[in-house]
Amino acid sequence: MADLGKKYCVNCLADVTNLRIRCAECQDIELCPECFSAGAEIGNHRRWHGYQQVDGGRFSLWGPEAEGGWTSREEQSLLDAIEQYGFGNWEDMAAHVGASRTPQEVMDHYVSMYIHGNLGKACIPDSIPNRVTDHTCPSGGPLSPSLTTPLPPLDITVVEQQQLGYMPLRDDYEIEYDQEAEKLISGLSVNYDDEDIEIEMKRAHVDMYVRKLRERQRRKNIARDYNLVPAFLGRDKKDKERERAGGTVGVGGPGGAVGSGSGATVVPAGPLGSSTAATPKRKITKEEKGQRTKLRALCQFMPQREFEEFFDNMHKERMLRAKVRELQRYRRNGITRLDESAEYEAARHKREKRKENKSIAGSKRGSSGGGGGTAGLGGGVGAGGGLGGGGGVSTIKEEGKDSEFSAIENLSGFELLSDREKVLCNSMNLSPMRYLTVKTIIIKDHLQKRQGIPSKSRLPSYLDKVLKKRILNFLSESGWISRDAS
C-alpha cells in the first residue's frame, strides 16, 4: 500500500515529495520538474498556466552526487549561520545547522561548494581590486592630521623659559593670548532639566571658546614662522654680531649688517666671508625697509616664505624698471646696440667730469679775480692791470678747452640732437639745423627707394662729398638707413 505522506507526479507518477511544481489555476495538479520542463498537459491544465514551487526541504541542492547528502533546508541554515556568526566560527554554525553536522563537516562543505566550487569561481574574481578609498585630507586641509599635530618645543634655555613663562612640555605660556577665554566655559554645566534656549546658549559659549583657542594657536604659529621668540630674546642681534665678527677675519674686509629687527641681513664683503655664508642675502634698501614696516601687519596672512618672495619680486620689478629706463635713454640718444652703450657711458662720464672741472675752475676764477684786483690796488695800476689781464686770458682759454660743444651749443636745434649727433656736428663744424635738414632729406629718399618710388636726391649746396659720406655712414651705423644705402 502506498505511503499516504508522499506526493506523486500526476503525469509520470514519480515521487515528488521533496520538490514539485503545483499549478496555480488547476486543482490537484502537481508535476515533477522533468514533466514541467517538457510542458506536460493533463485535462484542463495547460503549460502556460501560472505555477508555484513546493519545496519539502529534503532534496539535495547540489544533486545526488554531492558528498554528505546536504538538503536544501540545511543549506539555507548554513547560509544563515555564516551571515550571523561570520566566517570561521564553525562550532556555532554547526549548532545552528543541526546536531547531525559536525564543525569539520560544515567547514569542508562550505569551502568545497561555496568557495572552490562553481559558485565560488563564478562569484569570486581572480584578482580583487583595491576598493579602499583614502578619505584623509591633504596636509593643511580642513581635516588634515597635521592640524592637530603639536609643534616641537622651542629651542631655548631654562633661563629664557623662565623669562618668557614658557612650559615646553605643554607648549604653552603662563600668560596666553586672551587669558580670560577660559571663563566662558568654566562655569558651564549640562543639566537634564535645561531648556532648549539654555542648551543653545551653552553651545554658543563653547563655540566662542573654540574660536579663541584657534586664534591663540594661530598666533603661536605666526611667532614660530617668523622667529619672533629669538628676536624678542635678542638672539638675532647676537647672531649678527657673531657673523660680523667672523666676517672681519679675511682678506676681503669686514662684512656689513644691513637691516633692523628680524628683517636684518648680513652681507659678507670678502672672499673668505662669502665662502662662509651658505646663502648670502641681498642688501635691503631704505625704501624696502619702509615698505616692510608698513606691511608688517599683513605678515599674519601669509607665511614667511611667501612674504620674502613678495619683496624679492618687488626688488626684481624695480631692477627691471631701471633697466627699461636705461634702454629708453640709450634709444633717445641714438644707440641701438648694447655694444655701443659702454662707449656712450664712458663719453658721458668724461663729459660730466669736464662739467665738474669747469664749475671748479669758475669758482677758482672768481676768487683769483678778486685777488688780482687787490694786488693791482696795492702794487700799482700797471702791475695790477698786467696781472688781471693775464688771468683773464688764461681763464678764457681754459673755458674754451672745457666746453665741448661751445661752437654749436647756442645755435637753434642743438637740443634736438643726441649726444653722438652733437659730437658729429661739432667735428664737421656743421650747424644743427643744417644737419637736421640733410638727415631728413636722406631718410626721406631712402624710404622712397625702399617703396619703389623713383626719387632724385637734392642735397643742399653747402654739403660736399666728404660731409655727405660721413653723415651717411653715421646714419647707417645708427640704424636710420640700411648699410647698402650708404
Swiss-Prot record:
The main location class comes to: nucleus
Instruction: Describe the function of this protein.
Output: Transcriptional coactivator.
Q: Where does Zn(2+) 1 bind?
A: 9, 12, 32, 35
GO aspect biological process, one term = regulation of transcription by RNA polymerase II
As for subcellular location, the record says:
Nucleus
Question: Looking at the keywords, is Transmembrane helix present?
Answer: no
What domain of life is recorded for the organism?
A: Eukaryota
**Does the UniProt entry include the keyword 4Fe-4S?**
no
Any one Gene Ontology molecular-function term assigned to this protein's record: transcription coactivator activity
Which residues participate in Zn(2+) 2 binding?
Answer: 23, 26, 45, 49
Q: Where is this region: Disordered?
A: 237-291, 343-377
ZnF start-end (ZZ-type): 4-59
Cellular component aspect of the GO annotation: nucleus; SAGA-type complex
Leader sequence segment: none
Q: Write down what this protein is called.
A: Transcriptional adapter 2-beta
Query: What keywords is this UniProt entry annotated with?
Result: Metal-binding, Nucleus, Transcription, Transcription regulation, Zinc, Zinc-finger
PANTHER family cross-referenced by the UniProt entry: TRANSCRIPTIONAL ADAPTER 2-BETA, TRANSCRIPTIONAL ADAPTOR 2 ADA2 -RELATED
Q: What is the lineage of its organism?
A: Eukaryota, Metazoa, Chordata, Craniata, Vertebrata
Note the Pfam families from the entry.
Answer: Myb_DNA-binding, TADA2A-like_3rd, Tri-helical_Ada2b_C, ZZ_ADA2
Xref: InterPro entries: ADA2-like_ZZ, Ada2/TADA2, Ada2b_C, Homeodomain-like_sf, SANT/Myb, SANT_dom, TADA2A_B-like_dom, WH-like_DNA-bd_sf
Q: Where is the composition biased (Gly residues)?
A: 247-262, 367-377
Name the gene for this chain.
Answer: tada2b
In this protein, which residues make up the domain named SANT?
65-118
List all disulphide bridges recorded for this chain. Answer: none
